[in-house]
A protein has these predicted regions:
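Beta-propeller domains
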Residues: 297-307, 312, 331-340, 344
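Aromatic/basic-lined ligand-recognition segments
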Residues: 162, 252-262, 273, 332-340, ...
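Conserved acetyl-CoA binding element of GNAT-fold acetyltransferases
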Residues: 176, 180, 191-203, 365-377, ...
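Conserved beta-hairpin
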Residues: 159-179, 322-366
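An N-terminus-focused feature that recognizes amino-terminal "leader" regions
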Residues: 2-294, 315-324, 425-432, 436-440, ...
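Membrane-interfacial loop- and helix-cap regions that link adjacent transmembrane helices
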Residues: 296-309, 349-352, 360-371, 378-387
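Active-site proximal loops enriched in glycine and acidic residues that flank catalytic Cys/His/Asp
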Residues: 342, 354-357, 397-399, 460-463
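Generic hydrophobic alpha-helical scaffold/packing signal
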Residues: 304, 325-328, 335-337, 396, ...
Length: 466
């Protein structure tokens, strides 16, 4: 730990503190002293220009004051978690508020019925104009209606978890938050949870501390059905993440990405070299690769669950074929899934891979200045095509067989020296085979995405992606 390292590096430091008064050393609260040292070190690291952005953010998070999250059942940033277990024990029904939380005057709660076209359109427009955009306000997610139905209407969805806030006077939808039920495994424990998503506020509402109210209200509704754990993601560091991920972007249409400002602009030889290095063949190379069909659902479920369970400590569990059919059967403009027929076992699948479509709107033309709807092009700037969106594919789930039957010869076992090292050797060989297979599948996914007209292929450094 950082504090132990500091004391070992300067053993006289602690002695000087303990000997600086006549108070017996035993009366000092060593835990508080450690926390103070940790805070000082974190404060210093948060301002260190030599540290990475992630290191600075994590350090800043340790000393940040979160008025809302400090009241919630989440670990504190400085807290060391040693054991698995629920942060929030189940509540008795009489402990759960039956009525919604009070909203500021002029606002009212509502349910958004995703299956009603007019309400779906309201929700879509709220996201389109107010949801996630990059730090420079150049791009914003542009969800299709069909994508939102896919995301919010899985088997077992709860209409009460599609929570909106309207203006009491105009009835305009000004805020939204949603949840869907998910089954998760945390090591060897299966837990029913809520996955929270699409927290969105109208830009005019962001100074009124509405987000905590939305989170509390959807939490209340989740509690009412006996669920007391939830998972969610955030674009900023909040206390305390189970995991942090970084996006990686693989260009499929480098010229367009440069013209829109998504990628750094290159010219001449640099551009030609980049385009050449990103070249992809027109056909996939994995034998037996084809689009997923309805008849594949059962095998994909077994393949995916087995892959997740043998590779990761925290994972979703797909309990029914209906879930697999919903999330993975190909939907035009939403999700694409490909399976591989096993050449060694006719009728069986050896692998699958999927990606989903989420375009981004281009908010600012490169080289242009926006003002009252007029784009003024600076002198000497070559006009660029008026792109309105970037077509992005996102790597979704994948799975490959994990039972490769790797064995060691007697000579190899003796060379390992112990049973433990022999098992490690087998595991390393299996991992190498899985890595090679997944790399081949991912390359084919790039080829298929490019052929489908995507401009960029995105993925997070999670699962085996890293």
């Amino acid at each position: 730990m950082a504090d132990d390292g500091a004391n070992k590096a300067n053993p006289g430091k602690q002695q000087a503190v303990e000997g600086s008064s006549n108070v017996p050393a035993a009366s000092f609260d060593t835990d508080k002293l450690r926390q103070l040292i940790q805070q000082l070190e974190a404060q210093s690291l948060s301002r260190d220009p030599g540290a990475s952005k992630l290191q600075r953010e994590e350090a800043a998070e340790k000393v940040a004051v979160h008025e809302f999250w400090s009241t919630q059942p989440v670990p504190k940033s400085s807290e060391e978690v040693k054991d698995d277990g629920p942060l929030h024990p189940p509540l008795a029904p009489e402990q759960i508020p039956k009525d919604p939380y009070a909203l500021p005057e002029g606002m009212e709660w509502c349910l958004i019925d995703i299956e009603v076209e007019s309400e779906m359109k309201e929700f879509h427009d709220l996201l389109l104009n107010n949801y996630v955009e990059d730090a420079d306000s150049m791009f914003r997610f542009n969800y299709s209606l069909e994508f939102l139905r896919w995301a919010l209407l899985p088997p077992g969805f709860n209409k009460d978890w599609h929570v909106g806030v309207r203006s009491s006077s105009t009835k305009e939808l000004i805020a939204f938050i949603s949840g869907i039920p998910v089954d998760m495994m945390v090591r060897d424990k299966k837990i029913r949870m809520a996955e929270i998503n699409f927290l969105c506020l109208h830009k005019d509402m962001r100074s009124q501390r509405m987000a905590p109210l939305l989170i509390k209200e959807v939490t209340r509704r989740v509690h009412l059905v006996g669920i007391f754990q939830a998972v969610y993601t955030a674009g900023r560091l909040l206390p305390k993440p189970v995991s942090t991920c970084r996006y990686f972007h693989r260009s499929l249409n480098p010229k367009k990405l440069m013209d829109t400002g998504f990628s750094q602009k290159l010219e001449g030889a640099q551009l030609a070299k980049t385009v050449s290095s990103l070249w992809l063949p027109t056909l996939s190379t994995t034998p037996g690769l084809r689009p997923m069909r309805k008849g594949d659902v059962g095998q994909v479920r077994k393949l995916l669950n087995r892959h997740l369970k043998t590779r990761y400590d925290v994972l979703p569990v797909f309990v029914t074929d209906a879930e697999i059919a919903h999330w993975f059967l190909p939907r035009e403009g939403v999700v694409s899934t490909y399976v591989v027929d096993d050449a060694e076992a006719p009728g069986k699948l050896s692998d699958f891979i999927s990606f989903y479509s989420l375009p981004s709107s281009v908010l600012k033309p490169v080289g242009g200045a926006r003002g009252k709807g007029v784009v003024r092009k600076p002198q000497g700037v070559k006009p660029q095509p008026a792109y309105t969106s970037i077509n992005a594919a996102y790597l979704f789930y994948y799975g490959t067989k994990t039972d490769y039957g790797v064995t060691l010869t007697e000579d190899e076992k003796q060379a390992c020296g112990s049973q433990k090292k022999a098992k490690e050797s087998v595991k390393n060989r299996e991992n190498a085979l899985i890595k090679s297979r997944l790399t081949e599948l991912a390359r084919d996914a790039l080829i298929l995405a490019k052929q489908a007209g995507f401009d960029v292929f995105n993925c997070l450094d999670m699962m085996d992606n890293s």
